[in-house]
Amino acid sequence: MKRLLLSLFILVTHFVYAQEVPDFPDMRSWMINSNDSDRYVFADTAYVRVTPDTKQAPLDTLFAGDNITVSDVTTNGLTIRGLKGPWLSINYIRNGVHKSGYIWQGLVSCKPMRRGDVKFVYGIERRADSIYRRGKNWDTIPRFLVKLKVIRNGTILAKATLTTYDDESANTSEGKVMSGMGLANVQNIVVLSFSGEACGIPTLDYYFAWTNNNQLVRLSNKMNVVDAGSLDHSETFTFPNEKNGKPDRIIWNMINEEASDKIDKHGEYIMEVTDKKTTTYIWDGVNGTISKSMQ
C-alpha cells in the first residue's frame, strides 16, 4: 500500500511540475537548459534585471559579445519581435566583479564560437513569416530571421542575416568555424546548422565567408535528409583545399538515393542512385562576391 501511495505521489508531482513549466517552442534552437551554459550576449545592447521581468529598472547593461553563464531557466515569459521566451538567471563578470541577474533569452546567443580574439555570435533576431496564396486561401510559412555578428574586443565588425524555416528542422542549432578552406582573402568559413536530428527531417547548413578585410559574405546553402532504409538526399561542398578542389571554386554536389527492391545479405534494402547533380560557384576574393558558373 505504501509503495502504491508513493508511486501515485511521484506521478502527481511530475504532472504538477509539467503543468507549471511553460513551453517556449520559439526558443528551441538555443538548446539552453537549467545546467550551467556559457553563452555570449547576442543583442547589441541587453539590460540585466534584478527580477525576471521588466517591472524594475535595469540593474546593469551588457553588450554584444559579452560573456555570460546561464545558471537557470525561469518560468516567466516575455514576447519580443514575435518570439516568446523565458527569462534566464545569469552570472557574469563586470570590471573584475562577479555579478548576477536576469536577462531575456532572446538577447542571448545560440552556440558560442570563436577563433582567437574574434567571436562569431549568432541568434534568432525575430519572426520572418512569409505569406503566399494557394487557390483562394492565404497560407503562412513560419520562418525565423537569424543574424550572425563578428565581434572583436567588444566592437561589432560585421553582420549578416539569413532566414530559416520554423519547423522541425529548427529543433536544434549548431555553429562551427573552419579555416578559409583555400579561398583567396578568406580567414574563416562559418557554418550555421539547423536540424531536427531525426529521420526524414532536413539538416540545413548556411555558409559564410569571413574575409581578411573584415567582410562577412553569405555563400550558398546545403541540405541533407536521411530516412533510414528509404531515402538519402545528400548535398556536399568541395572547397579548393580539399580533394578534387579547384582554385577559388566551391563545388556543390547532390546525390539522391532511394531503396530498391533488392535486399543485401543483412536483410536491408539496397539503395540506388536516382539523381545526381553538380554546380560550381566562383569566388571573387578581391570584391568578396560569389557567383554561379554558367558552364
Question: Where are these predicted regions, by residue range?
Answer:
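Boundary regions of SH3-family modules and the immediately adjacent low-complexity/disordered segments
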Residues: E20-D36, G82-S130, Y207-L219, V225-D227
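Short aromatic loop motif centered on NTY/YTY
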Residues: M178, F194-G196, T203-L204, L216-Q295
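Short, solvent-exposed loop/turn segments at conserved positions within beta-propeller repeat blades
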Residues: R81-L83, N137-F144, C199-T203, M271-K276
